[in-house]
Amino acid sequence: MPADFVGLSYEVQQLANPDFFSLKNSGLIRQFRDLAPLGVLRLGGNTSEFATWKQSANAPDPERPNTREVAGEPRAQYYAVTPEAVRNLAGFLHATGWRCIYGIGMGTNTPQRAAAEAEFAAHTLGASLEYFQLGNEVDLFGRHLRDPQTWNAQTYLDEWLAMARAITARVPAARFGMPDVASNIEWLTEIANRWASIPNPPRVVTLTHHYYFGGPATNPAVNIPNLLKPETMAKVQKTADTANTDAKKMGVRVRMTEGNTCYRGGKPGLSDVFAAALWAADYSLLLASNNYTGVNLHGGTGNSVANSVGGSLPGDALLKEQGETPQQIASHPHPFYTPIATFGSEYLLEPVGYGLKFAGALSGSTFVAEDLTAKLQAAGVNATAYAVKLAGGHRSVVVVNKDATKDVDVTLDFGPKTTGAAAVQTLRAPALESREAHIATGPAAHVHNGKVTVTIPHASAMRVTLA
């Protein structure tokens, strides 16, 4: 599990306000640093396809291609990304200790403009640049940005190669992640199968995909029981197996670069409550145990995410139908799934962010084989377990008890020579539906004959660590 496994994903449109990712935004800097000392900020999202690189104030606007307006997809609202925004981003990254996956649109862009932006970004961000991402959810371009009759993984790859080669010509050390699909993992397979036949390909270091449990907010099947049931993570495991097989063919690893509980901005009562914290902890650790380089949970400001999905959040309409007043609606985080919420000038870590933080505490560790998850689920408890060896040599086990009613007693065997006490950390809230989450240190657990017995209450997670 890399030391910078923890990640957040934001819309590129956040750069339209150069002060957002800047040294001026001390509140957001504090939240990033508190979430993880090392991490990866990914800039992308649907709005990246309508960003225009504006090298200077008097640079003319480029010609705009025709696009289609489709429900759930962004309107063609163009905006500028400026050198000031990128310079400020560099300061923000330096202050947080994080690195950046820098997204450049493909949908309405040209290789020449992309190369100019990439050259400036690479020079300005320096060591803070993780790699470039070209295009966002390219498997959905046929809906509004390309001819659905001809758009597929092969035509995408042809366009991607032209853009990536233009960038590499100006940034010889450029690295890339691809293809950043929304859900069609088969595209990874098609790309991996073709990759060996591509002469002198650009340097790809990561295969990337997105993941949302379901959506939109109006879908009744998007609920807490379905979010937390074992079958949900079984599907995640299947995707990870496919992605890892494809990555191995290309000699790279995999990253989940954008995802969360419910697409199109999240669902109130699901995305902004403690159930999302348990989901985030379990989801992150499952992918970490599958050799992923990281997880980037999507969020940001309500306006940027609303713009990315057509101008409004379905969750707001749902709350209005349920009778909430404008003041009550405003009390929810916007978007509902954001790990770090914006309330006026304040930034608050939301439950889903606490889940990511809890899992991220294991960053830098090595996973070890264990069969505790199978034993727990065979006993009829909806729980998962992950065992690691920390960077300093300590051993740690995390149990995520997603069961709504059953507490679980677990005996952890660390070997007969182990003595002393084990440190305990918990992730808890009053209920799955609570709009809060807490990470706390519990009483030390006694080690007897190398074994530690602990009780993990229902709807909570626990980490037990031995020196």
Predicted regions and their residues:
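Noncatalytic carbohydrate-binding groove/subsite architecture in carbohydrate-active enzymes
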Residues: 102, 111-113, 117-119, 152-283, ...
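Short, solvent-exposed loop/turn elements at domain surfaces
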Residues: 14-19, 50-52, 217-218, 431-436, ...
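Carbohydrate-binding surface patches
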Residues: 378-418, 424-427, 459-462
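N-terminal catalytic cores of secreted or lumenal carbohydrate-active enzymes
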Residues: 1-194
